[in-house]
């Protein structure tokens, strides 16, 4: 009962914030302000929606549209691209998600986008490539490349180290579990993730 009440309170608060943010989306506002408001609208809905709930599914479509508009109004708004990528990924649109993250990394290095790309390429390797194929290995190498890029941006970020550990472990199995050095590298990355760096 308490969880349900808290969820209802959260939804009421969300509605109030969304109403307030709609004031910032008007034509009298700058494109930058409108983009930021649309991004916040999309992100709030995406973060709080239950992806299995029918009513929330409609709200998620609205969130997707808001994020697309935000990215169109301000293509340099990295958060909008990343949030849109996560939303598309949850819907199973892996190519769309990859395009969103690539839009961010094409402009400048971005740790969050690189972390997302690392996870996404492992998902693509599993979903779109047969085990042990060159295609799968290529996707795994992309995952590893993006994880290493994220680490390079912040040596103390445990999440980046964790992604690198997962990429090495995936590579170990994708290559037939024959190279124990990959497993050792994976374990070292997990250790660095716990410590917050090497």
Predicted features, each with a name:
Residues 14-34, 52-53, 68-76, 103-113, ...:
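Flexible helix-coil transition and linker loops at the boundaries of alpha-helical arrays
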């Amino acid at each position: 009962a308490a969880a349900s009440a808290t969820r209802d309170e959260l939804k009421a608060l969300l509605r109030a914030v969304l109403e307030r943010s709609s004031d910032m989306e008007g034509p009298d506002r700058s494109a930058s302000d409108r983009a930021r408001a649309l991004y916040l609208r999309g992100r709030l809905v995406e973060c709080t929606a239950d992806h299995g709930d029918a009513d929330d599914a409609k709200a998620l479509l609205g969130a997707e549209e808001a994020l697309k508009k935000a990215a169109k109004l301000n293509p340099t708004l990295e958060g909008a691209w990343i949030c849109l990528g996560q939303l598309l990924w949850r819907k199973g649109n892996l190519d769309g998600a990859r395009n969103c993250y690539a839009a961010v990394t094409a402009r400048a290095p971005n740790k969050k986008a690189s972390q997302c790309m690392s996870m996404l390429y492992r998902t693509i390797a599993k979903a779109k490539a047969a085990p042990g194929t060159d295609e799968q290995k290529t996707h795994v190498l992309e995952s590893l490349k993006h994880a290493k890029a994220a680490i390079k941006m912040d040596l103390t970020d445990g999440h980046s180290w964790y992604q690198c550990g997962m990429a090495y472990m995936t590579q170990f199995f994708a290559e037939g579990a024959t190279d124990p050095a990959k497993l050792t590298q994976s374990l070292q990355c997990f250790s660095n993730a716990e410590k917050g760096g090497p």
